[in-house]
Amino acid sequence: MADKKANDSFQMSIYEHLEELRQRSIESIVALLISMVVCSLNINILIELIKQPAIGIKFLQLSPGEYFFTSIKITLYLGIILSSPIIFYEIIIFIIPGLTKKERRLLIPILIASGCLFVAGLIFGYIYITPIAVRFFINYGKDMIEPIWSFKEYFDFIILSLFSTAISFQIPIFQILLGSLKIINSKMMLSVWRYVVVGSTIFSAIITPSTDPLIQLFLSVAVMFLYFSSILVLKLFKL
């Protein structure tokens, strides 16, 4: 049967499944640790890249160990991102035996697409969104006070900005999942496009606290492009 659980070559006992989980977990942790070591060996270069959007700002260490613990956070976050392809691969290999052929055809491409879109969102945020937001806060009130920032608070802001943009790039994944589960369809999504335009505009204004309408329009158009691209995918699959 086409929808039957994976064929005999994919069947596993409970013990084998637990052993597989242990092995995949170990390999994922090793990949993460190696990535963190690589990041820690290049921490000065990475910190310079993080500071790049805030050229001219003087950073302070406001408490003992602030820079040290922030450096650890940097190696952890970037280590996760760097090792994410291997971690995604381990997840996919682990879940395959428990999926039907139909579920495999749906879930595996979604996981791969989700990872690619997340990384694309991080890159988009670093190149376009974060620099604009940082410059806005630098220039706001600069005639009244001198901008001297805590490096920890700055890094937390950068992470929030990047991950907010990356999560917004997951919109197509949610749409395709909802469409595949028959919760909503492409016609329903298309019927509310006006509300989506307004929502994306508001979202862009929140994510980019800048008076520059061009960058807000840029992000809004990117979100709308992802939204309508997902509708097209659902239409192609008649969902």
UniProtKB/Swiss-Prot annotation:
Gene Ontology BP term (one): protein transport by the Tat complex
Residue intervals passing through the bilayer: 30-50, 76-96, 107-127, 157-177, 188-208, 214-234
GO-annotated molecular function: proton motive force dependent protein transmembrane transporter activity
InterPro entries: Sec-indep_translocase_CS, TatC
Short name of any one Pfam family annotated for the protein: TatC
Swiss-Prot/TrEMBL keywords: Chloroplast, Membrane, Plastid, Transmembrane, Transmembrane helix
Region forming the signal peptide: none
Localization of this protein: Plastid, Chloroplast membrane
Membrane topology: Multi-pass membrane protein
Disulfide bonds: none
GO cellular component: chloroplast membrane; TAT protein transport complex
Chief location: plastid
Family: Belongs to the TatC family.
Name of protein: Uncharacterized tatC-like protein ycf43
UniProt organism field: Cyanidium caldarium (Red alga)
Gene: ycf43
